Amino acid sequence: MFEDEPHAEGAAAVAAAREALQALCQELNLDEGSAAEALDDFTAIRGNYSLEGEVIHWLACSLYVACRKSIIPTVGKGVMEGNCVSLTRILRSAKLSLIQFFSKMKKWMDMSNLPQEFRERIERLERNFEVSTVIFKKFEPIFLDIFQNPYEEPPKLPRSRKQRRIPCSVKDLFNFCWTLFVYTKGNFRMIGDDLVNSYHLLLCCLDLIFANAIMCPNRRDLLNPSFKGLPSDFHAPDFKAAEEPPCIIAVLCDLHDGLLVEAKGIKEHYFKPYISKLFDKKILKGECLLDLSSFTDNSKAVNKEYEEYVLTVGDFDERIFLGADAEEEIGTPRKFTADTPFGKLTSQASVECNLQQHFEKKRSFAPSTPLTGRRYLQEKEAVTTPVASATQSVSRLQSIVAGLKSAPSEQLLNIFESCMRNPMGNIIKIVKGIGETFCQHYTQSTDKQPGSHIDFAVNRLKLAEILYYKILETIMVQETRRLHGMDMSVLLEQDIFHKSLMACCLEIVLFAYSSPRTFPWIIEVLDLQPFYFYKVIEVVIRSEEGLSRDMVKHLNSIEEQILESLAWTNNSALWEALHASANRVPSCEEVIFPNNFEIGNGGNVQGHLPMMPMSPIIHPRVKEVRTDSGSLRQDMQPLSPISVHERYSSPAAGSAKRRLFGDDPPKDTLMDKIMAEGTKLKIAPSSVTAESLSISPGQALLTMATTTVTGTTGRKVTVPLHGIANDAGEITLVPISMNPTQESTAESPVSLTAQSLIGTSPKQTHLTKAQDAHLTGVSKPKRTGSLALFYRKVYHLASVRLRDLCLKLDVSNELRRKIWTCFEFTLVHCPDLMKDRHLDQLLLCAFYIMAKVTKEERTFQEIMKSYRNQPQANSHVYRSVLLKSIPGGVVVYNGDCEMTDGDIEDATKTPNCSSEPVKEERGDLIKFYNTVYVGRVKSFALKYDLSNQDHIMDAPPLSPFPHIKQQPGSPRRISQQHSLYVSPHKNGAGLTPRSALLYKFNGSPSKSLKDINNMIRQGEQKTKKRVIAISGDADSPAKRLCQENDDVLLKRLQDVVSERANH
């Protein structure tokens, strides 16, 4: 079959591979069918890819896949999977370590495009390996604490079989205890890859062996005489053990980061019944496990049973940790004695370093820090082991809910009763339904996960329910304070809000226990759409201050997963939301807050619109009032610019009715009605509002104008107008939406207007005031609502990742903005490109095509090298990209034509569910770029080709790039134990001696510092910030004299407010 090989070198390589595989199969006693399949797969992969490293290692990967596919008929159970060849034997014969195997296996799965089920199997296997490695690293020091050091024992002398038995050594005890643990753990599959439960099961095994050593009169020499858990009279000459075996679970939990309640639960409900079953089956026997007459038989029986388990059910022989070659086979750091040679120490340290690097790269137990959401992280905690970190997470969770019940508190009940319709009955019904669904799926075995015991499910559920009511109460208190006196029925009647919040609490509990049921398991079993679930994540993080740093990282990474891929699946509710909003995808400028854009190259915020005149100069104090750093006290500042009400409802302005999760409907404010029905003001035939206004490249935004209309009450209202000039020379005046009936008081922290700056403010309705109070001085985006919030977060996430890539690749700001413009074009005009794909895929393609068009080329390898360093990077993102799906799904367009409205409508409609599975054609990112992406984006990208003069005039203006605040939570508390805060240095005029005391480190005399200390001791109050004054204050030395009169300043302030309100 190899005569057609084009090169002799290739034929020789295949022949060598065949020989190596034959030798490997003979050593493993493997059947010919699996060997032939393994060789065929290896040959096919080698023909398409360059396989680096030893051939035998890649053959081991191919052989393992072939063995897992093999089915062998059996006498009792029908069929058995796996050829009775364990992974450990394959790796041992191929001289391949487990860490190397997992690394190569991931690449092999990508190259072979193996099914998702097999990938999940490898992930479970790798997690089980990591759990076992972590547990073994804890097992050794705990064993040394209880028993004698097995490494200091003299070697056993060889003896004949006829010689009488000798007592077990400490080394034998060490091996027996570990083997009993891994065999017991294998029986409870729901415990196997759960780090917390596995650790407590280990403590139970150690407790059992300790009790047997104490109860055996001639085996107490195995114990460490300095162990703190020994009975108080242990060292007395006449010591006699009690009739009941002693329990040291509490001592071990206290000394070695255990959770007493959890460990006792494992011992009573799982371990003790199982050990009794082993005695009933005669696997274990004897009054004492360590008796001279029974230990050898017990050890052999447990090892035999475990070997059968590995061949039939298991895959990874965890006794590999006990072998002399453990360093080479797996990378386990070993215990060593004081006289261990230095060279051996260096070798072990190197292996331990490799193992640590593997865990750091894998991040199974300590999640990596995502690029977004870092402002919510607390200070770093002391470095701990994974077990200590996991048990501390559970302890922290238990401390958060300590003293609370899984029911509404009195304060929460009062909030429920204050609502127009008491929502308590419905909330309890929802929570109960979620609990029943959770317990059912948590205890149910599937192909992906073994089922857990109902006790575990009930325990996790109870913690989640307590946390749910605690966080719900915090949210309601914050919302009540934020939306003064507003009825909370609107929010509390949203079932999806309660379902999302409860799901988030369950995810927190599962993560704290290091459960193998990782996200998105919880939303899948609760049938909760990711597009709805993400909204609650930031709310939870802001509401519960007790969450650990790792927990916040985990929740942030979940939000990123949803924004980057989970919300873009074919059956996502996102497409329904787009369809409901007339298939109009919002641009970045429409959803980001106006003051959150980077300053353009020309020095103005509106750098993306070069023909727009620059804003008037803004007084520093005005700028301060209009931003988050204004005179509003820090403790009174809103926690987020988006309230929970806005996340879960999208009302029309001035309407008390809210639509769940729909985008805000077309603006139908009172002013619009006045303009359309009252005075029939005919300034222009256009009826669009400023919110829906889009400026094409051929149009120019002119300065502001005003007109006066009379409302139904007879009041006259001044309406600011946009002036837009088009190519035909016509000017269209478009009114900016505002509500003439708004009421507010001067002291309320409402959105800033020009009139409020000079002391008179328009009236505002109570509902609008409640909704806008949190936007203290910050202009709203053009589009708000559920869809706008989603795209705001998507644009923010993409901008953070693009900024990181550009910094690593030294990309100019100009090219970065062109990449961003191209990326935004694909989201807005080609939304179907994101369906069943990943945000990073479009971002990387936009990066490459714009770099190529602008002649600032970066090779694909350079881009991917920088991308892989991002915390969320995963090989499947660029190795497995959807090309097309049949039926339905993505339509691959040929040609350079842009999508029509009809195309967008078809793409955003969710296809009907079909019983037939969707067939997907997938390839790597390069293939997607060449076959799909270029055809859709090429004509747009070429408009920025500077070498072609014809395209320069057609190039659309560059989209604004979101700005990232370096210290959004300033001043930031850097320690939970001390009242120590850090804030960025404010650029401005230096403080004068009359207004403040100044001390420069390494520059000022000690007297200056003493003066500051004396002032603090005397309790002088901090000087309050001056409020802006329009009239000149002659006695203020720090204030420049204003050369303009009040009318001119008022006009400039009106321009500022109007401009900021609409851009």
Curated annotation (Swiss-Prot):
Keyword Nucleus recorded: yes
Region (Spacer): 585-779
Modified residues (Phosphoserine): S640, S650, S748, S761, S959, S970, S983, S1004, S1036
Function: Key regulator of entry into cell division. Directly involved in heterochromatin formation by maintaining overall chromatin structure and, in particular, that of constitutive heterochromatin by stabilizing histone methylation. Recruits and targets histone methyltransferases KMT5B and KMT5C, leading to epigenetic transcriptional repression. Controls histone H4 'Lys-20' trimethylation. Probably acts as a transcription repressor by recruiting chromatin-modifying enzymes to promoters. Potent inhibitor of E2F-mediated trans-activation. May act as a tumor suppressor.
Alphabetical list of SMART domains matching this protein: CYCLIN, DUF3452, RB_A, Rb_C
Protein name, per record: Retinoblastoma-like protein 1
Region described as Domain B: 780-944
Signal sequence range: none
Record region (Domain A): 383-584
Residues recorded as bearing Phosphothreonine in the entry: T332, T369, T385, T992
A cellular component annotation (GO) from this entry: nucleoplasm
